[in-house]
Structure formats: structure tokens, C-alpha cells
Amino acid sequence: MDIFNAIILGIIEGITEFLPISSTGHIIVAAQWLGIEATATNQAFGVIIQLAAILAVLANYKDKFTPKHLNLWIKVAIAFIPLGIIAFIFSDVIKALFNVPVVGVMFIVGGVIFLLLERNYKEQNCTTTDVTQVTYKQAIWIGIAQVFALIPGTSRAGSSIVGAMLCGLNRKASAEFSFLLGLPVLAAASGYDLLKHYDLFTFDDLTALAVGFVTSFIVAYFTIKLFIRFLENFTFVSFGIYRIVFGVILLTIAYV
């Protein structure tokens, strides 16, 4: 992994991890276009820049890490359980789906879902306008919705946001619960991969790792802030359109 590729992947991870456009899908495509081989070391690099994105959430929502918000974190933990169980049981099946055609199709499917959701969504009818108001029942349904993110190209953020909106959360609360839910999900996935591949890195890899980590953290930190501001004035329609267009481009490249 050279410095240039580390910066590019760090930027992509930072932008896409918490937006409903599938960070995994973008990383897979970018790696192929950059000619980065799917070696264990390069896959472990992906884990490192993902950890940076996790820290960006911690930095943005440090006020939520207090005893008075314990109830919120219990709900986050409950929402994590469905994905954790399914990912553990079907990990080999999931890995077999990591290819451009699957990513392209799921980009389109996710885009259509967002367009259909926004067509009938009325924010003034939402029962939950703050992330701390999420109920246990809502947390369970959001967790079930997040399971679909195991299909590459679906987007963890996208599936959890859709689930949250369908459960009565407004757009901002949906996005923020998705951010917080990303902490145990990404920490579990990253921790597991690091335990498997920690011995693969050499001293020569440290510079690229550091550059990718810092890049991902900075970009993710500001992406989260800008995304929340965006949702105060706009809908997810633009993300739905982007997903469909990007998915069509991927399938065209894959089959033409």
C-alpha cells in the first residue's frame, strides 16, 4: 500500500462510512480501479481506516458517553444483536458476495428503496425527534433492518436509517442512531479482523497506515457534521438517485 492509495482509500472511507451509500461497495470498487490486490495485508489496512471512522463518531458525540445516557447505549446494544448473530453464522457466505455485480445491484435496490420511502415520508408525523427518545421496540426493528447491510453494496448506514425512518424517527434522529449503532458494529468487525491479521504489518507499512488512519478520521469527522446539517434542510432523495446512477455505472462496466 503506497501513500497515494492510502490517502484515496482514507478519503473514501471517511466520506462513505456513515452516509447511506455503502462504504464497503466504494472501497471494493476503488481498490479494483487502483489495482490494489485483495491481500490479507490490504484487507487489514481497511480495518485500520475503519477504526479511524469509529473514533470520528466518538469525537462528534462525546457528550453521549455519560452515565445519564446509559439507557441509550443499552438500546444500541440491543440493535446490534441481530447483525452480530447473522454475521457470525454466515460469515463465509457473506464474503463470497464481495464482487462488483452484487455491489452494483444492491446500490440500485437501495436507491429505489430510498426514493420510495421519501415519496410517502412525512417528517411532521414522526414520533421520535431525538436519538435519546428511541424506544426498545424501535431499537429491535432498526437492528433487524441493519442485517440487510451484510449484503455488499447495501450500506450499513442506509439499512439502519431506512429501518429507523420506518419506525417513526425523523431524518436527523435516524442518522444519529445509525452513527451510534456503527460503533459496536464496526468495533466488532475491526477487532475481529485485527486479531486475525495483526502480525501481517511490517515497519514499512506504518507510514501508509498512519496516513490512511489520519485521513479517514479527519474526513469522517467533518462528513458527520455536514451530513447532519444537510438533513436539517434536505431529504434522502439525492442519495437514492446517486445510488441508482452509481449502480448502473458499475453494472455497465462489469458487463460491457
From Swiss-Prot:
Alphabetical keyword list: Antibiotic resistance, Cell inner membrane, Cell membrane, Cell shape, Cell wall biogenesis/degradation, Hydrolase, Membrane, Peptidoglycan synthesis, Transmembrane, Transmembrane helix
Cross-referenced Pfam families: BacA
GO MF annotations, alphabetized: undecaprenyl-diphosphatase activity
InterPro entries: UppP
Membrane topology qualifier: Multi-pass membrane protein
Transmembrane segments: 1-21, 38-58, 70-90, 97-117, 134-154, 175-195, 208-228, 236-256
GO biological process: cell wall organization; peptidoglycan biosynthetic process; regulation of cell shape; response to antibiotic
Catalyzed reactions per annotation: di-trans,octa-cis-undecaprenyl diphosphate + H2O = di-trans,octa-cis-undecaprenyl phosphate + phosphate + H(+)
Cellular localisation: Cell inner membrane
EC number of the protein: 3.6.1.27
GO cellular component: plasma membrane
Enzyme class, spelled out: hydrolase
Source organism superkingdom: Bacteria
Main localization, broad class: membrane
Physiological role: Catalyzes the dephosphorylation of undecaprenyl diphosphate (UPP). Confers resistance to bacitracin.
Additional detail: Bacitracin is thought to be involved in the inhibition of peptidoglycan synthesis by sequestering undecaprenyl diphosphate, thereby reducing the pool of lipid carrier available.
Family from the record: Belongs to the UppP family.
Name of this chain's protein: Undecaprenyl-diphosphatase 2
Organism name: Pseudoalteromonas translucida (strain TAC 125)
Organism lineage: Bacteria, Pseudomonadati, Pseudomonadota, Gammaproteobacteria, Alteromonadales
